[in-house]
From Swiss-Prot:
Domain notes: Has 3 domains, the large (RuvB-L) and small ATPase (RuvB-S) domains and the C-terminal head (RuvB-H) domain. The head domain binds DNA, while the ATPase domains jointly bind ATP, ADP or are empty depending on the state of the subunit in the translocation cycle. During a single DNA translocation step the structure of each domain remains the same, but their relative positions change.
Molecular function GO labels: ATP binding; ATP hydrolysis activity; four-way junction DNA binding; four-way junction helicase activity
Role this protein plays: The RuvA-RuvB-RuvC complex processes Holliday junction (HJ) DNA during genetic recombination and DNA repair, while the RuvA-RuvB complex plays an important role in the rescue of blocked DNA replication forks via replication fork reversal (RFR). RuvA specifically binds to HJ cruciform DNA, conferring on it an open structure. The RuvB hexamer acts as an ATP-dependent pump, pulling dsDNA into and through the RuvAB complex. RuvB forms 2 homohexamers on either side of HJ DNA bound by 1 or 2 RuvA tetramers; 4 subunits per hexamer contact DNA at a time.
Keywords: ATP-binding, Cytoplasm, DNA damage, DNA recombination, DNA repair, DNA-binding, Hydrolase, Nucleotide-binding
HAMAP family in the record: DNA_HJ_migration_RuvB
Residues given in the record as ATP binding sites: L23, R24, G65, K68, T69, T70, E131, D132, Y133, R174, Y184, R221
Gene: ruvB
Catalytic reactions on record: ATP + H2O = ADP + phosphate + H(+)
UniProt: DNA binding residues: R294, R313, R318
Protein name: Holliday junction branch migration complex subunit RuvB
Record: residues binding Mg(2+): T69
Annotated organism of origin: Bartonella tribocorum (strain CIP 105476 / IBS 506)
Major localization class: cytoplasm
UniProt EC number: 3.6.4.-
Amino acid sequence: MHKDEDQRLLGPAPLPNDPDRSLRPQVLDDFIGQEAARANLKIFIEAAKTRQEALDHVLFVGPPGLGKTTLSQIMAKELGVNFRSTSGPVIAKAGDLAALLTNLEERDVLFIDEIHRLNPAIEEILYPAMEDYQLDLIIGEGPAARSVKIDLAKFTLVAATTRLGLLTTPLRDRFGIPIRLNFYTIEELEYIVQRNARLFAVKISDDGAHEIARRARGTPRIAGRLLRRVCDFALVKQAKQIDRKIADEALSRLEVDHLGLDPLDRRYLLLIAETFLGGPVGIETIAAALSEPRDAIEDIVEPYLLQQGFIQRTARGRILTEKAWSHLGLAAPASTSIQKRTQLSDAQDNVSLQTTLWDGEDD
């Protein structure tokens, strides 16, 4: 991920000074939002405890910052077992994975974040570990090489990914409990902001909490980060409490608008609007023009813009919606509807194709 993207105020990736570690709920009943996922996890955990067996392997899917790591830690606590954590890119060789797995005790939870970035060779070793609780390792090289099987404790693998499509089918099929996490509602985020403010011993009004929540991009981690920054403004201004005026002033100075868009989001929208007349435009072109990696655009910027209805993905590329033009305060082109622009683009392609065919006949 791009360095600048990593440090965005509204980036969902955790920052070193984020307050959310100390604010994380410790049990499922304290976890706010994700009602369906939480209810199902309660049942699965209770069933595993009743049977005195390891919980089936769990796969969390969803944008960053929605609570995948927190839910994994809560699961381990609810099960009364140890929790080990790592991430896909960190497991560089077979020995790294073997060291992790052989140190697990019965029913322990192993959390692997960004599992879609796991080395394919490591993934092959993970298959028998997940299915048969065995490690198949090759010791030595050449004619002297031999296969060694190591029995493992029955553990639970909890994995998280932001890009389900990058997981191979064999790996995806080995997870007995797939769970999708969605963006939070403003009401849920408002409750989280008020809860965090109490833990910070900071007074906040309902409209102040609402103002922070509606700019938090549906992400609890970002809500906590924005609350901390607004607290800084309130402290310096010697405000008795955080109200809507204080929150609006602080967040406006941080260039976070009323829908939670930051400068990178606006650059993205303006690029499509001004340079490409609203689209369609391909993701590679957008990434190159913004000097950002394609992965950062697809994983960090676009999910929220899609969820808010600012853009649409088509077979021909990204297209701005009426809502995006309105938010930017720009007049849309005459043929502004997505259908009209797509049809126009297809018609242009057909003309180009026919011209090429006629040129070929002339030759």
